[in-house]
Amino acid sequence: MKMNPIVELFIKDFTKEVMEENAAIFAGAGLSMSVGYVSWAKLLEPIAQEIGLDVNKENDLVSLAQYYCNENQGNRGRINQIILDEFSRKVDLTENHKILARLPIHTYWTTNYDRLIEKALEEENKIADVKYTVKQLATTKVKRDAVVYKMHGDVEHPSEAVLIKDDYEKYSIKMDPYIKALSGDLVSKTFLFVGFSFTDPNLDYILSRVRSAYERDQRRHYCLIKKEERRPDELEADFEYRVRKQELFISDLSRFNIKTIVLNNYNEITEILQRIENNIKTKTVFLSGSAVEYNHWETEHAEQFIHQLSKELIRKDFNIVSGFGLGVGSFVINGVLEELYMNQGTIDDDRLILRPFPQGKKGEEQWDKYRRDMITRTGVSIFLYGNKIDKGQVVKAKGVQSEFNISFEQNNYVVPVGATGYIAKDLWNKVNEEFETYYPGADARMKKLFGELNNEALSIEELINTIIEFVEILSN
């Protein structure tokens, strides 16, 4: 779905930052509230009642928590228990949490006490190095995939959580290493603030420090907020006041070079994150295929075709995932390595991911899992040839068919190159007959290019150019 130009530009720019590993996420309370956790105001409602205040009339909840402690001789035990009870509840992750965990982002900051970010990363089989004490900053978890900085503490240690006014006043001394770490990330990374209200005194202090140091050279950051809507029975004047206040708030964020993306509803956050994820995934191609013979192709020409196709995909900045299919995989490797080593002068492990299939009976039982693991990393699946030897006869490879089914199930764009024959031709016929199902809304150019993928009269160069042009349209 096409969004307004400001959102489209943000998606394009932030996708680039994620792919270049310059992106970071700052998650606020709004992200956690979407799973069913109550707001901070609702959490403190019984505390306010106990000291004779109405939480609905209080804007400064940090001071409210401090008042409660003052009235109880500095004892915050009940508040600690409320935090533990609320944020220890088992809840389901939202799609936003899942997408944020799937993205190739390695830095997450949050003021939330809950463990939703860690849980989301764990479900993606990523190792999270969680930090919520000063001492933890000095250690590094082995083979970590992401660092989660919980600058206000963790639910399992509520007595240490940053909560009352005293905590905020002492933060710059007690938690100074966190201030320095966040300041450094704000300088070197592009942040996306999600579910954040920017009322936190600590973040305001850190942003001000960065602004003072860099003035007009601050790095661009982004935040997603929902535009104000008129409440039932709200006076027009009150609504206009809130709208004006939001306009001034957005203008103030620009002092810190934070670009605000205003949304009509919170569902748009999921749509935007899905677009970013899809943009990233379509830059990684799954090459599916196996062959003991190559249809009308001479073996030498087929090997050259696979070699050159892989090389050209890398040259066009696509990454490749392959299962090392017989008669295909080795030529994929050669093409990729030639482009990376000979022409680009470097070999990056992310550019080619190989997942050779396990052998033996036990391995066969794991093949579906292996296929899903490979394909989930990609956004486009290209299918070549697809044959094997079975009982001395050349037969169509069911494994390539399985990879097609999984690819479509996981919303990958499927690109069967029918001109290579065998299963690939069967798959091309299937997609061609139901083109609108596989490519809804595709224009005449895409339809024409797809038709050319079945043209056996094309030269190797012409067929490769057609594949590349088709895949580039998908990635854009």
UniProtKB/Swiss-Prot annotation:
CDD domains: SIR2-like (cd01406)
Keywords: Antiviral defense, Cytoplasm, Hydrolase, NAD, Nucleotide-binding
Summary of activators and inhibitors of this protein: Activated by a molecule generated by endogenous ThsB (AC J8G8J6) or ThsB' (AC J8CSK2); activation in vitro is 50-100x more sensitive to 3' cyclic ADP-D-ribose (3'cADPR) than 2'cADPR. 3'cADPR activates the NADase function of ThsA by binding to the SLOG domain, which changes its tetramer organization, allowing NAD to access the active site. Also activated by a signal molecule generated by B.dafuensis TIR1 (AC A0A5B8Z670) and TIR2 (AC A0A5B8Z260), and by BdTIR (AC I1GTC2), a plant protein involved in defense against bacterial infection.
Effect of residue 152 to A: Loss of NAD(+) hydrolase activity, does not oligomerize correctly
Residue stretches making up the Deacetylase sirtuin-type domain: 4-283
Protein family: Belongs to the soluble Thoeris ThsA family.
UniProt protein name: NAD(+) hydrolase ThsA
Organism: Bacillus cereus (strain MSX-D12)
